[in-house]
């Protein structure tokens, strides 16, 4: 299991009241599977992505990335996990318009001086269609 989310809940405080952003979110993702998260603006998609990347913590529930509980990691270990295993491709307006789709996907690998950025980018673009 690459990703497993169990009963995830995220609440934020606003004055004297609590706002529930995510409630009882559960899913799992095996290697080679894809998952689309859709919904209107304000429905919690970005909050969910932040939790999955370890950028924020859930009110309750568990997230396992490669069978490692994000809840049990300190910030330094979450940062290492993000660096090694997590990446985002943002909506088109976040991409560099002067680069092709392939070049935009290659860019993070090139900035990190990784081997074979073109080959890796082509592989991932083929995986997502």
Region spans (language model):
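The feature captures the beta-strand-to-loop junction immediately N-terminal to the Walker
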Residues: 38-40
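Short coil-to-helix segment of the ABC ATPase nucleotide-binding domain corresponding to the Q-loop/switch region
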Residues: 97-108
């Amino acid at each position: 299991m690459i990703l497993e989310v169990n009963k995830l809940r995220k609440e934020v405080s606003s004055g004297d009241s609590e706002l529930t952003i995510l409630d009882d979110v559960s899913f799992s993702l095996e290697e080679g599977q894809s998952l689309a998260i859709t919904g209107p603006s304000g429905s919690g998609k970005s909050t969910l992505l932040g939790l999955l990347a370890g950028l924020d913590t859930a009110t309750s529930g568990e997230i396992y990335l490669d069978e490692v509980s994000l809840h049990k990691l300190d910030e330094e270990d979450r940062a290492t996990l993000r660096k090694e295993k997590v990446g985002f491709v943002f909506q088109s307006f976040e991409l560099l318009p002067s680069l092709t789709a392939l070049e935009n996907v290659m860019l993070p690998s090139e900035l990190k001086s990784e081997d074979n950025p073109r080959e890796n980018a082509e592989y991932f673009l083929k995986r997502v269609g």
